[in-house]
From Swiss-Prot:
Role according to the record: Catalyzes the NADPH-dependent reduction of L-glutamate 5-phosphate into L-glutamate 5-semialdehyde and phosphate. The product spontaneously undergoes cyclization to form 1-pyrroline-5-carboxylate.
Protein name: Gamma-glutamyl phosphate reductase
Transmembrane segments: none
Locations listed in the record: Cytoplasm
PROSITE patterns named in the record: PROA (PS01223)
Major localization listed first in the record, in broad terms: cytoplasm
Organism, as annotated: Shigella dysenteriae serotype 1 (strain Sd197)
Domain of life: Bacteria
Key word Nucleus present: no
A single GO BP: L-proline biosynthetic process
EC number: 1.2.1.41
GO molecular function terms noted in the UniProt entry: glutamate-5-semialdehyde dehydrogenase activity; NADP binding
The encoding gene: proA
One Gene Ontology cellular component annotation held by this UniProt entry: cytoplasm
Catalytic reactions of this protein: L-glutamate 5-semialdehyde + phosphate + NADP(+) = L-glutamyl 5-phosphate + NADPH + H(+)
């Protein structure tokens, strides 16, 4: 089955690579229209997936990721339309010039070819990834989690209908609908057909891909994100940022999971934090120093376990640790962070600059929420993933991250001396 999918995707990629920006945008507009026109089919399939997942004991955080509503589906369709408005990087001349030999040389952006994406209970990823791949002239093979099997099948069927109506092969966007995990290992060895693989899931999936894949892998998406409250932070303003970073949508990878509080501000900051977190329904997991103060406040508080500093809660839970200074905060982030998104709240711009320079994450913020790490917020459109590695792409992966380049030399029967 996968062999045939690979062949179809590779053949489709050749046709996609030749499309003009106008032709690609026409396809995307058709997909957006069909997602809305056939929304009832997708929502009914999703309702079945959610019901099965709940019956199987899936946690609330994952159920939130899985669930579609009419508003969410419309938002997904609107995101596709936003991709139409983005500049097409394919064909862009990055640099070039004329060599001493007279050869005119240029470096031009081109599609990667076929992208493989493995992800869990995130039905929006199906459309986000497909739209970005089509915009950049890439075919894509999707492998969603078993929890989204019906939703993904319905969504991809709608996308393929739109492709066919535009004269393009269905092989441009395909989904593996068999939940057999053995197919993941088989997919990881499809280097004959797949040019880049993006896993969007937990640490176990990332480890499997690194160990077994014969395809270049872009890893990321695991977000143990930190906010450091410096001693000069404005408490009221800092709390607004923390509430946003923790509670706006707790199930996302850019949600803060650990709060590091400078010891010199702890006495005044922690009581205010407790009050705010109680109102927001957040459970605090505090170290010994913070626990003594937080236990007298209104927020629910428990003693933090050492391993929780490495946890991506994806829920209304927040670690709180008192640190001695900026050095202590940076050391903690280096030990427990996932190089996703980390922030400092401070009025001391020297400390802010040190934090930016010394915290080696894909996104680092000064006096801002970690929730900004998102393709849409960055002006990149829908994102295919958030890369936490350093090669090829880093941070939210927009259109350029789905391209490579080729060198093109144009001569007049020019030969090398």
């Amino acid at each position: 089955m996968l062999e045939q999918m690979g062949i179809a995707a590779k053949q489709a990629s050749y046709k996609l690579a030749q499309l003009s920006s106008r032709e690609k945008n026409r396809v995307l507009e058709k997909i957006a229209d069909e997602l809305e026109a056939q929304s009832e089919i997708i929502l009914n399939a999703n309702a079945q997936d959610v019901a099965d997942a709940r019956a199987n004991g899936l946690g609330e955080a994952m159920l939130d990721r899985l669930a579609l509503t009419p508003a969410r589906l419309k938002g997904i369709a609107d995101d596709v339309r936003q991709v139409c408005n983005l500049a097409d990087p394919v064909g862009q001349v990055i640099d070039g010039g004329i060599l001493d030999s007279g050869l005119r040389l240029e470096r031009r952006r081109v599609p990667l070819g076929v992208i493989g994406v493995i992800y869990e209970a995130r039905p929006n990823v199906t459309v986000d990834v497909a739209s970005l791949c089509l915009k950049t002239g890439n075919a894509v093979i999707l492998r969603g989690g078993k929890e989204t099997c019906r939703t993904n099948a319905a969504t991809v069927a709608v996308i393929q209908d739109a492709l066919n109506s535009c004269g393009l092969p269905a092989g441009a966007v395909q989904a593996i609908d068999n939940p057999d995990r053995a197919l993941v290992s088989e997919m990881l060895r499809m280097d004959k057909y797949i040019d880049m693989l993006i896993p969007r899931g937990g640490a176990g999936l990332h480890k499997l891909c690194r160990e077994q894949s014969t395809i270049p892998v872009i890893t990321g998406g695991i977000g143990v994100c930190h906010i450091y409250v410096d001693e000069s932070a404005e408490i009221a303003e800092a709390l607004k940022v923390i509430v946003n970073a923790k509670t706006q949508r707790p199930s996302t990878c850019n949600t803060v999971e650990t709060l590091l509080v400078n010891k010199n501000i702890a006495d005044s900051f922690l009581p205010a934090l407790s009050k705010q977190m109680a109102e927001s329904g957040v459970t605090l997991h505090a170290d010994a120093a913070a626990l003594a103060q937080l236990q007298t406040g209104p927020a629910k508080v428990v003693a933090v376990k050492a391993e929780e500093y490495d946890d991506e809660f994806l829920s209304l839970d927040l670690n709180v640790k008192i640190v001695s200074d900026l050095d202590d905060a940076i050391a903690h982030i280096r030990e427990h962070g996932t190089q996703h998104s980390d922030a400092i709240l401070t009025r001391d711009m020297r400390n802010a600059q040190r934090f930016v320079n010394e915290v080696d994450s894909s996104a680092v913020y000064v006096n801002a929420s970690t929730r900004f790490t998102d393709g849409g917020q960055f002006g990149l459109g829908a994102e295919v993933a958030v890369s936490t590695q350093k090669l090829h792409a880093r941070g939210p992966m927009g259109l350029e991250a789905l391209t490579t380049y080729k060198w093109i030399g144009i001569g007049d029967y020019t030969i090398r001396a």
